[in-house]
Amino acid sequence: MEIKQIAVAGSLESSDMMITISPNDGQGIVLELDSSVEKQFGNHIRALIKTTLANLGVESATIEAVDKGALDCTIQARTIAAVHRAAGVEHYNWKEIDSWNA
């Protein structure tokens, strides 16, 4: 999926995450994470975001993630929403997304 514009999903409320995604002209995935639990879960959060991006077919984007203690399902949902908004996609393939959790 091609990232065409800047998009945001989520909030800075407790137990949530704000994901900002933008195009970066073919420089791969650049991920910046700001998390209050980075020492304990930073590697896991990064891996989850990158896996979700790979599942969506995103090969090039800059992602800024500000985590406020979000659960995995929230991180994945915010990433999916931001990618679809940034790509201009209006219809989700729920069967494909659901298959990731099999």
Curated annotation (Swiss-Prot):
The keyword Cell membrane does not apply. One of its GO terms (cellular component) is cytoplasm. It is found in: Cytoplasm. Keywords: Cytoplasm, Phosphoprotein. Its main location: cytoplasm. HAMAP family: CitD (MF_00805). This is Citrate lyase acyl carrier protein. The gene is citD.
